[in-house]
């Protein structure tokens, strides 16, 4: 009922246009869902996770948002099991990309080794949104000095044909370029990416406001036919 009330002040046609082919979209604004998730996290959130439905896209999104608002379980594996249950229900890029780990960067730093291995497993999964989850989350938390080389290798090894996987890899590698331009440039000159993904990376780099004009000119010249 609460979701249906929020849907009344949302924009269903716009949300559907952003998520083509996804059924049962209510069109609720993301900030409204985040507020609701924060409220649920302060109450009986475990009961919510156990009884939550997945009919509407926004119900799936809300499930992930609640996982990002709660205090993570003392046992990391219990929390990751909850996250895994969420990943299995992802049915759109927007459900995937609105997720954040509970506890923020401090939580990630404290459990970096296990979380890194966890995300690598998703990058090797079969499902389109499972792989996207691994790519987007690794981009969000692990584009750093310690993980860059392995991260580039992971992205380069992905062979999934899903559109939303390719777009995620392109996005992630453009972020790598902004943060580590020289080392990512070396990678761009010698990689095994398909042409669509490779050219999308270049496009995203050119569109970035954090890349200078001369570099953008060079990047444009690297496009594959």
Name what the model sees in each region.
Residues 1-225:
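Alpha-helical scaffold domains
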């Amino acid at each position: 009922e609460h979701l249906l009330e929020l849907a009344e002040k949302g924009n269903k046609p716009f949300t559907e246009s952003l998520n083509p082919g996804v059924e049962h979209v209510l069109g609720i604004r993301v900030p409204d869902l985040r507020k609701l998730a924060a409220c649920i996290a302060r109450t009986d959130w475990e009961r919510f996770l156990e009884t939550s439905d997945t009919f509407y896209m926004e119900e799936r999104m809300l499930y992930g948002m609640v996982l990002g608002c709660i205090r993570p379980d003392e046992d990391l594996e219990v929390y990751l099991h909850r996250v895994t249950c969420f990943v299995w229900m992802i049915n759109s890029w927007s459900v995937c990309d609105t997720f954040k780990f509970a506890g923020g960067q401090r939580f990630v730093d404290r459990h970096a080794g296990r979380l890194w291995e966890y995300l690598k497993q998703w990058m090797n999964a079969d499902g389109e949104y499972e792989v996207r989850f691994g790519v987007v989350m690794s981009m969000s938390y692990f584009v750093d000095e310690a993980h860059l080389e392995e991260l580039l290798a992971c992205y380069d090894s992905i062979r999934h044909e899903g559109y939303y996987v390719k777009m995620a890899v392109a996005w992630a590698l453009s972020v790598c370029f902004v943060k580590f331009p020289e080392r990512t440039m070396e990678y761009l000159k010698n990689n095994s990416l398909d042409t669509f993904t490779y050219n999308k990376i270049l496009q995203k780099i050119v569109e970035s406001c954090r890349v200078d004009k001369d570099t953008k000119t060079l990047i444009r010249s690297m496009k594959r036919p």
